[in-house]
Amino acid sequence: GLFTPKTVGGVRSMRDGEHYTAVDSGRIVRYSYRTGERLAVIFDRATATPSIDFTDYRFSADETRILLSTDVKPVYRRSFTAEYWIFDTKDGSLRRLSTGGPQQQAAFSPDGHRVAFVRDNDLFVADLADGAERRITSDGRKNHIINGIPDWVYEEEFAFARAFEWSPDGRRIAWLRFDESRVR
């Protein structure tokens, strides 16, 4: 309409403040803010092994790793499950975050060495150095206990889809636990 805002979609600022990334034909490309020039392809699904069709991405704080989401399936308005992959920009390796089933709300630790995520209403942490996966909660159960993600009402009314956060030093995780066991 007449008063609809125009936006630039898919642009991600890099931490140096001089560059940004955007997706172009299955590639994550770095550009210069100053010139708009395309400077480098950071990730290319066509040359990645295995080749994956990602729908979204996030950098670790130091921008050496990229969390890529694939096979995205909606849950509610803002939430979804996905298969996440980790791309290491230093050595070009690409590996699946977890093989235990679809995950929700994967998030890098502040140092970029671990990723927390929710699966089947339980919170997990994957160590990226050795691939070890640690289950943080074990009482998650559909329509009873939800750890690390909000229930439908909180997601819908308060517009958030992740209910956990890393501490600034990355040593701890705080999360919300929703008990729906008495909801009829």
PLM regions and their residue ranges:
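Beta-propeller folds
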Residues: 1-184
